């Protein structure tokens, strides 16, 4: 029979199985844990409850604060307070900041309406500086001599009464006391146990403080309910040594434990290192069924890799169970028991958190509170017996947290897929908005940590937005824990540069970076940083001194190492760069590459225009290729000095020069230009990225007169930069055909081409090429550049039919969006040349028939042009699938978001680059 009150859990476990144990490891002690049976725990807690009942501050049914720094004390006094007829309220670790610590104690006192706290002698000092709460040392109570039979608690609880108070993390402000009832907790435990059956003679493993809902309910109380042993270890010992975590699971035949994503990654890394050792360790993990994971987003890649490793030691493949839960839901209540297969099958970068256990229901709603259909992002709401009913003494917060029809508003965003699985999208209140674009702070933090930046401590990175007085948009603030010594200024500057570049790549915005000492970056018992608390401290000015010192040291370093202009021309250009990018000389000198400051294609064009105005050019006479090939002030000055000297055409444009992997070569679309690749290249930091640009843009250049002419030019360009393979080439639209032909030529000459990518182009294109005359090429170019809409381009195709080129050109210029036209620094002569290049590229492909084969091909397909196919499935299955006729292995297809003209544009480039990088890796590149 299911117990209805929490004390019954311990009483039943003690009576049913006197040998069931709580096994406790103290800090630093790995060999000799303390073991206490459930029967002995009940006897000890009963004695302690007498001391609680007899204390002068005792009030039946009231909340009693508990503040201890070890598992045993928390467990004993949790039960003592319950058995005394009171409500235990377990506090998290107090802040190291005296001001914050006092404020927190005063807040706890007013919330709980209590003036005392049970603690240990060693922790009394933490209550200094305040009068709101009186610490009572349990060592002074003389409870060991009490008779367990003398407990005369007069309060008889009901299932709906509050059994336990736990505190929210405060991620949305001051912590709130969550009222968890007996019925709610028992319902939650029963629901959790039904998700994954656990073997007999196994145990639960906990490594976080009992103040966390996962430790007290998901481990301690659930183990009692399941009649299984439970093992408690200090978190710092486990996190510092993942191998010991594996030892514990094997030694105690652990069936259920938990680990957030950051710790899963550490376990994976430890196992990989173990496999490389001369004598690899082995573990029997055949009893392991359930590694719950939550508290932060789980990456499918990490879960997949670790699952495979754990499987080799006897665990099931689905042993890692990502989930969702809150203090308000008694920890995990939504679980994905099909990870990683489900997430891989659905192409999820971050795992789904699954479906509801018994006792809870979920829905996703819009801003009006209406439930949304599968696939649409909205607000996550929960209901059911497992969900709490109120925050203690906080009716305003309670009312705000529930809808009119009684659903709990979690504050998280998510979508439900067609199978009812939940995919989270971050907390609504944590979203960063920069210039109208929304970013997830977690994704920015992940991006920074995934780059393994030297000088930055993993898992101590926190990102948030802040609106400075007078600012029109928020700025991104990123704080981190450095690994370098405070006096190592070069490392300080290099770390800031590396972080800045990653954030710029992720958001297009330069971050405000502050290194902080560890005391200012406290973690919860689950190893999480509180974004809201850190943000609040920043906005209160608590990091101002650290920020000022950091800025001063880096500025001094820049001044000592910066390269100064050699002449007035370089000085003038440098001033233009600084003004265009809105940065200071401390951040940029004559030898800083422009792409290191996160420049995009629009900023590049604006820079070009500013330089032309500075030089007094009446027309746009500086080819964009000059800026693409000469990315520093010094290089550009030399290039401009030679601008009017005869220059041989070079198709190679360096978009990203760094990285130790083989380069990626990107071939222009039908417009011939490579600006479309600039945003994509910013995300590819592990290898150089080169683009191949068509001939004919510069004054005096003639466009290609045949496919062979273009292929030979591009082949020579590739060989000049990368003499040896393996090669990776990809083309966007029209460029896919050229990438295919260049790949064939490389293979014919004995080179290995390991990756050929087609961005949304089928192999047979000549009929489409023949349809595009000069007018159509110009109209497509105008639409591609966002000068006119697609609808208007189709209308103009009819209206301008039969007119001469000059008339057509002027008509399109007249129709063009004037702001966009100016933004792109276009001129009539240059737009005309651009149309010539596009037309000649299409003309020479009018008789193109693909032949031959390459080793492999990856096709990235998006929503096609309406004229090309009626649907995405038709596009893939009928047209793109024909690439199979021209490869020596089956084509790999990659479904990417967006439409043909937007698939690598700003809206979709972040998703596209992740798919592209994964495809490169799968090809061994």
UniProtKB/Swiss-Prot annotation:
Its main location: cytoplasm. InterPro entries: AB_hydrolase_fold, ACP-like_sf, AMP-bd_C_sf, AMP-binding_CS, AMP-dep_synth/lig_dom, ANL_N_sf, PKS_PP-bd, PP-bd_ACP. It catalyses: 2 3-(4-hydroxyphenyl)pyruvate + AH2 + 2 ATP + O2 = aspulvinone E + A + 2 AMP + CO2 + 2 diphosphate + H2O + H(+). It is an enzyme of class 2 (transferase). The modification O-(pantetheine 4'-phosphoryl)serine is found at residue 601. One of its GO terms (molecular function) is phosphopantetheine binding. It is found in: Cytoplasm. SMART domains: PKS_PP. GO terms for biological process: fatty acid biosynthetic process. Residues 663-923 are annotated as: Thioesterase (TE) domain. One of its GO terms (cellular component) is cytoplasm. Keywords: Cytoplasm, Phosphopantetheine, Phosphoprotein, Transferase. Residues 11-434 are annotated as: Adenylation (A) domain. Disruption phenotype: Results in white conidia. Residues 564-644 form the Carrier domain. AtrA has a A-T-TE domain architecture. The adenylation (A) domain recognizes and activates the aryl acid substrates, and loads them onto the thiolation (T) domain. The thioesterase (TE) domain shares the missing condensation (C) domain function, and is responsible for condensation and final product release. This is Aspulvinone E synthetase melA. It comes from Aspergillus terreus (strain NIH 2624 / FGSC A1156). The gene is melA.
């Amino acid at each position: 029979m299911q117990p209805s009150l929490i004390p019954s859990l311990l009483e039943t476990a003690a009576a049913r199985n006197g040998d069931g144990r709580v096994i406790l490891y103290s800090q630093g002690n790995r060999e000799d844990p303390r073991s206490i049976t459930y029967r002995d725990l009940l006897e000890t807690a009963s004695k302690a409850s007498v001391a609680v009942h007899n204390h002068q501050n005792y009030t039946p049914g009231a909340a009693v604060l508990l503040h201890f720094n070890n598992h045993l004390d928390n467990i004993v006094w949790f039960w003592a307070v319950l058995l005394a007829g009171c409500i235990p309220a377990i506090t998290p670790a107090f802040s190291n900041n005296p001001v914050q610590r006092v404020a927190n104690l005063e807040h706890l006192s007013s919330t709980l309406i209590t003036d005392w706290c049970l603690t240990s002698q060693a922790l009394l000092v933490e209550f200094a500086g305040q009068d709101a709460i009186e610490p009572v040392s349990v060592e002074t109570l003389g409870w060991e001599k009490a008779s367990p039979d003398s407990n005369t608690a007069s309060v008889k609880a009901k299932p709906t009464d509050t059994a336990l108070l736990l505190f929210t993390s405060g991620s949305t402000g001051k912590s709130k006391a969550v009222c968890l009832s007996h019925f709610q907790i028992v319902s939650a435990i029963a629901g959790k146990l039904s998700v994954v059956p656990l073997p007999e003679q196994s145990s639960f493993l906990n490594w976080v403080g009992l103040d966390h809902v996962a430790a007290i309910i998901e481990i301690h109380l659930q183990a009692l309910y399941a009649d299984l042993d439970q093992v408690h270890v200090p978190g710092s010992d486990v996190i510092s040594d993942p191998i010991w975590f594996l030892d514990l699971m094997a030694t105690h035949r652990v069936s259920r434990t938990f680990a957030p994503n950051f710790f899963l990654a550490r376990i994976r890394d430890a196992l990989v290192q173990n496999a490389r050792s001369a004598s690899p360790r082995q573990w029997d993990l055949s009893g392991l069924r359930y590694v719950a994971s939550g508290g932060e987003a789980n990456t499918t890649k990490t879960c997949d890799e670790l699952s495979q490793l754990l499987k080799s030691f006897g665990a099931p493949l689905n042993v890692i169970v990502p989930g969702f839960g809150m203090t308000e839901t008694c920890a995990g209540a939504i679980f994905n028991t099909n990870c990683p297969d489900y997430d891989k099958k659905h192409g999820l970068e971050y795992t789904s958190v699954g479906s509801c256990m018994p006792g809870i229901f979920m829905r996703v709603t819009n801003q009006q509170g209406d439930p949304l259909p599968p696939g649409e992002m909205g607000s996550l709401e929960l209901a059911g017996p497992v969900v709490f009913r109120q925050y203690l003494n906080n009716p305003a917060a309670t009312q705000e947290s529930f809808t009119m029809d009684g659903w709990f508003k979690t504050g998280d965003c998510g979508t439900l897929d067609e199978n009812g699985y939940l995919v989270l999208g971050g907390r609504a209140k944590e979203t960063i908005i920069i210039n109208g674009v929304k970013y997830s702070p977690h994704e920015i933090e992940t991006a920074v940590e995934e780059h393994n930046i030297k000088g930055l401590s993993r898992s101590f990175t926190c990102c948030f937005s802040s609106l400075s007085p007078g600012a029109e948009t928020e700025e991104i603030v990123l704080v981190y824990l450095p690994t370098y010594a405070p006096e190592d200024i070069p490392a300080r500057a290099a770390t800031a540069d590396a972080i800045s570049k990653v954030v710029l790549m992720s958001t297009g915005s330069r971050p405000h970076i502050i290194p902080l000492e560890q005391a200012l970056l406290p973690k919860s018992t689950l190893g999480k940083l509180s974004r809201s608390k850190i943000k609040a401290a920043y906005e209160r000015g608590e990091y101002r001194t650290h920020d000022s010192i950091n800025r001063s040291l880096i500025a001094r370093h820049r001044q000592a190492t910066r390269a100064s202009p050699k002449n007035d021309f370089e000085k003038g250009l440098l001033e233009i760069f600084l003004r265009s990018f809105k940065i200071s000389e401390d951040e940029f000198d004559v030898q800083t590459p422009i792409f290191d400051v996160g420049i995009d294609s629009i900023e590049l064009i604006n820079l070009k225009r500013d330089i032309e105005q500075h030089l007094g050019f009446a027309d746009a006479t500086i080819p964009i290729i000059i800026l693409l090939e000469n990315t520093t002030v010094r290089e550009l000055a030399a290039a401009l000095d030679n601008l009017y000297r005869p220059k041989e055409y070079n198709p190679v444009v360096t978009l990203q020069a760094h990285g130790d992997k083989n380069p990626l070569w990107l071939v222009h679309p039908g417009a011939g230009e490579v600006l479309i690749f600039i945003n994509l290249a910013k995300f590819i930091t592990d290898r150089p990225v080169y683009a191949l640009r068509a001939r004919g843009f510069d004054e005096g250049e003639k466009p290609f007169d045949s496919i062979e002419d273009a292929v030979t030019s591009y082949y020579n360009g590739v060989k000049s930069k990368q003499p040896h393979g393996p090669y990776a080439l990809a083309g966007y639209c029209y460029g896919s055909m050229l990438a295919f032909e260049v790949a064939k030529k490389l293979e014919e000459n004995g080179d290995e081409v390991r990756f050929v990518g087609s961005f949304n182009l089928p192999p047979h294109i000549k009929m489409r090429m023949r349809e595009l005359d000069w007018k159509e090429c110009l109209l497509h170019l105008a639409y591609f550049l966002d000068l006119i809409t697609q609808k208007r381009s189709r209308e103009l195709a009819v209206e301008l039919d039969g007119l001469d080129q000059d008339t057509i050109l002027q008509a399109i210029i007249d129709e063009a969006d004037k702001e966009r036209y100016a933004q792109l620094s276009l001129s009539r002569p240059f737009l005309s040349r651009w149309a010539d290049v596009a037309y000649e590229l299409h003309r020479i492909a009018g008789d193109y028939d693909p032949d031959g084969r390459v080793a492999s091909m990856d096709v990235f397909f998006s929503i096609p042009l309406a004229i090309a196919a009626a649907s995405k499935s038709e596009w893939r299955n009928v047209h793109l699938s024909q690439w199979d006729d021209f490869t020596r292995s089956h084509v790999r297809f990659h479904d990417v978001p967006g439409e043909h003209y937007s698939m690598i544009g700003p809206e979709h480039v972040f998703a596209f680059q992740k798919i592209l990088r994964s495809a490169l890796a799968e090809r061994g590149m």
